[in-house]
Amino acid sequence: MHRWSKLFIPTLREAPADAEVASHKFLVRAGYIRQLAAGIYSYLFLGNRSMNKIIGIVREEMDKIGQEYYLPALNPREIWEASGRWAVMGDNMFRLKDRKGAELCLGMTHEEIMTEIARKELRSYKQLPQIWYQIQTKFRDEPRPRSGLLRVRQFIMKDSYSFDIDAAGLDISYQKHHDAYCRIFDRCGLKYVVVHADSGAMGGSGSQEFMVYTDAGEDLVASCANCSYAANVEKATSKLEAIEDLVATADTPELVHTPGQKTIEQVAAYLGVSPKNKIKTLAYMMAAPKGAKDGREQALVVLLRGDHMLNEAKLGAAIKGREVRPMTEEEIQDLFHSPAGYLGPLNVEWAKTSEDTEKPLLLLDEALVSRKNLIAGANKEEYHVRNLTPGESFQFTGSADLRMVAEGEPCPNCGHALKVGKTVEIGHIFKLGYKYTDAMGARVLDKDGKEVMPIMGSYGIGMERILTASVEQSNDDNGFWLPAQIAPFEVVVTPTNVSDEKLAKGAEEIAAKLEAAGFDVILDDRDERPGVKFKDADLVGIPVRINVGKKFVEGKVEVIHRSTRESLDATIPEIVEKIAAWLKPSA
C-alpha cells in the first residue's frame, strides 16, 4: 500500500514566477516535475507514475498494429546527410563530436535510422507491410523553451514508421495509426479534434494533427461544431459570402486623391466603402528556384481582399516552397516607382507564368478573381485608383487560396459558423511517400521481380503533451484532476485525524479493500490538519477522495468526485460500486 507519509510529494502553495500556463504552474506545485535547466525537466514520483501509465496505454495500442523497437539517440552525421536533413535541421539539432572528431547528433526523430534498417534488411514485397515503433527520449535545441512541458529541449516521443509496397498499402497503414491514436487519446480521457494539416518540412502527400483546444496552445485550428470539418489554419478553407461589388464611377480605372489616408480602414472610410471592396497589396522578394543559374531573387506581389489576412503556409505551397522575405521600402520604390503604402497592380508588366523568372509575379487570392470595381493603391503618394477588375484592368500571373480563415466564416462542408481557437498538438500522422526511401536507396522486389521503392508513413505522439493537455483541460483554482487511466492514483483515502486509532485503522481497511477491488490507492496517513490534506488532494490530480471522519462511527465516509465536486456519504459496502461508476471511462 502506498502511504503518503513515506513518499516524496513536494507540493507548493505558490507557482514558480516564470510559469505562464496552467499546466506548468500546477505540475510544479503538485510535485510532478522540477526544472533542471531551460526546457529540461525531472519527473518526480507522481509525474513519473502518470507518464508510465500514459506510456503503457500507448504501448498497448501500438502493439496491436506494430512492433516495438529501440533505436540509438546518438546518430552519425552521415545518415542525416544521406537524407539531406543534416543541413536542413540547422540550429534545432544538438550536434557534437566524439574524441576522434567524428560528428554526431542527438536524434530529434528517426526516419533516417528506420529507413536505414529497411534498406539493409527488406528485400521483397513479401516482407511488407511493416510498422515499426519506439518510445524514446528525443532532443531539440528549442530557441525559446517555455510553457513548462509544452516547449522543451528533451522530451519523450512515440514515433512509428510504416513501409508499404504501394500507396494503397500506405493508406491502410495510415488508417491503422489514425484509429490507434483515437483509441489512445480516448483512453487517456482527452477531448481532441483531428485536423487536416500542412506537411511542412516533413513532406509527403497527406497529414493530420490530433489537437486539444487550450489557451496555452500556439497552433490555430478552425473547426465546425455542426459537422466533422476541422483543419489547421495553415490548411483551413471556408465558404465566402457573396459581396456586392461597387458601381463603376467610370468606364476605366480612375485616380482618386486620398490625402492623409494610409491604412485600408482609413481609405475605405474616406471613400465611404467597405474594406471588402479594397485590395490589400503585399510585396516580397522570393528566392531563386532551385537550380537557377544566377540565383537572383524575384519580386512577388500578393493581392488579397482588404479585410483578409495572408496565410503564409498557403503562400508557400503556391510558390512551391521558395523562401520569401518582405520587400524593403527602398526596393518597392526602385522596382515599382511607388511609395510603400500606395503600391497597386496597375502599370506593371507582370510575369504571365510562374516559370518566367525575369518579371515580377502577381498572385491573386481566389476571393478577388471574380470581383469588379475594386480600389487599390495607385503607385503614387496619397492616391488610390478605383474601378479595378482583375483580368481586365490588369493581368496577373496566377491565383490560389492564399487567405487565413477567420472566426465565424461559413464551414466549407455545411455552412455552419467556424470556430477558430488555440490548440496544442498531441499527435501527428504523415504520408511521407518516397522522400526517405528514395534519398537513402531503400529498394525491394515487387511481385513481378522489379526493383521498387517502399512507400513510407511517419507518425508521432508527444507523451508529455498528453499529460499537459489533460491538465490544461481539467483545472480550477485549487489544482487539477486527471482521468483515472493516467492519474498517479485513482483514489486518495484521507483519515481526518490519524491520532484517532479507530479512524486510522478504518482508513487502512478501506484502502486495502479498494486495492483488493483493483483500484490504485494512496493512503494519506500524514499527521497533518485535515485542511492541509484536502488542499493537497485537490492539487495533485487524483480523481476521487475518501474522507474518513466523524461519521465513520455510523459506518459512513465522505466520497468526493474531484472534477464535479459531487460529494456523498456512503457506507463501506457502497464505496467500491460508487467509485467504479465514477471512474468508468465515458463512452
UniProtKB/Swiss-Prot annotation:
GO terms for biological process: prolyl-tRNA aminoacylation. It holds the Pfam family HGTP_anticodon. Keywords: Aminoacyl-tRNA synthetase, ATP-binding, Cytoplasm, Ligase, Nucleotide-binding, Protein biosynthesis. It catalyses: tRNA(Pro) + L-proline + ATP = L-prolyl-tRNA(Pro) + AMP + diphosphate. GO terms for cellular component: cytosol. It is an enzyme of class 6 (ligase). The keyword Nucleotide-binding applies. It is found in: Cytoplasm. Its EC number is 6.1.1.15. GO terms for molecular function: aminoacyl-tRNA deacylase activity; ATP binding; proline-tRNA ligase activity. InterPro entries: aa-tRNA-synt_IIb, aa-tRNA-synth_II, aa-tRNA-synth_II/BPL/LPL, Anticodon-bd, Anticodon-bd_dom_sf, Pro-tRNA-ligase_IIa, Pro-tRNA-synth_IIa_bac-type, Pro-tRNA-Synthase_IIa_type1. Disulfide bonds: none annotated. The keyword RNA-binding does not apply. Consists of three domains: the N-terminal catalytic domain, the editing domain and the C-terminal anticodon-binding domain. Belongs to the class-II aminoacyl-tRNA synthetase family. ProS type 1 subfamily. PANTHER family: MITOCHONDRIAL RIBOSOME PROTEIN L39/PROLYL-TRNA LIGASE FAMILY MEMBER, PROLINE--TRNA LIGASE. Catalyzes the attachment of proline to tRNA(Pro) in a two-step reaction: proline is first activated by ATP to form Pro-AMP and then transferred to the acceptor end of tRNA(Pro). As ProRS can inadvertently accommodate and process non-cognate amino acids such as alanine and cysteine, to avoid such errors it has two additional distinct editing activities against alanine. One activity is designated as 'pretransfer' editing and involves the tRNA(Pro)-independent hydrolysis of activated Ala-AMP. Homodimer. This is Proline--tRNA ligase.
